[in-house]
Amino acid sequence: MSPKFMFFSIIAVWSCAAVTEALFIQHRSLANFFFMTLTAAKRSPQEYDGYGNYCGWGGEGTPVDSIDRCCQVHDNCYGTVNENECGHYIRNVKLIDYDWHMEGTEIVCDPKDDACGRALCKCDKDIIDCFNENDKDYNPEYNKVIG
């Protein structure tokens, strides 16, 4: 086997392993917010994804209503947590796992998580509470994905 072939084979295997690990971490961590929404929000996660200017990936402009404002606050919360509690992590805070559970209708963040995990859980808990408090303002026409 030529050294060149061996080198490119190692690079290919390493690249595939890195991508697989990144996808696993992202799937696991984004699952927290997905399942929290699925479990505790009045609407499905799909009804919020792509809603207004801030719900989903990215965000800019003026929120279209109180639901979209919840997403803007959530984006800002993640930004603040990324700079403060999670500042020691190299990767994006959206990829960090945390534990939570339900007690009745209340979301409870695991106090055993580190400061970063607890803060991220609180960001996600707060947006679910905000969604539920403002559910009357939900307008399907603002959902770019399903509306």
UniProtKB/Swiss-Prot annotation:
Compartment(s) of residence: Secreted
UniProt protein name: Phospholipase A2 SSD1043
Annotated organism of origin: Scolopendra dehaani (Thai centipede)
Family membership: Belongs to the phospholipase A2 family.
This enzyme's EC code(s): 3.1.1.4
Disulfide bridge positions per record: C55-C71, C70-C130, C77-C123, C86-C116, C109-C121
Cofactor: Ca(2+)
Enzyme class: hydrolase
Residues where Ca(2+) binds: G56, G58, D75
Main location: secreted
Gene Ontology MF, one: calcium ion binding
InterPro entries: PLipase_A2, PLipase_A2_Asp_AS, PLipase_A2_dom, PLipase_A2_dom_sf, PLipase_A2_His_AS
Taxonomic classification: Eukaryota, Metazoa, Ecdysozoa, Arthropoda, Myriapoda
Tissue specificity: Expressed by the venom gland.
Signal peptide stretch: 1-22
GO BP term, pick one: arachidonate secretion
Residues spanning the membrane: none
Alphabetical keyword list: Calcium, Disulfide bond, Hydrolase, Lipid degradation, Lipid metabolism, Metal-binding, Secreted, Signal
Propeptide segments, given as residue ranges: 23-28
Annotated catalytic residues: H74, D124
UniProt-listed PROSITE patterns: PA2_ASP, PA2_HIS
SUPFAM superfamilies: Phospholipase A2, PLA2
Catalytic activity: a 1,2-diacyl-sn-glycero-3-phosphocholine + H2O = a 1-acyl-sn-glycero-3-phosphocholine + a fatty acid + H(+)
Role summary: PLA2 catalyzes the calcium-dependent hydrolysis of the 2-acyl groups in 3-sn-phosphoglycerides.
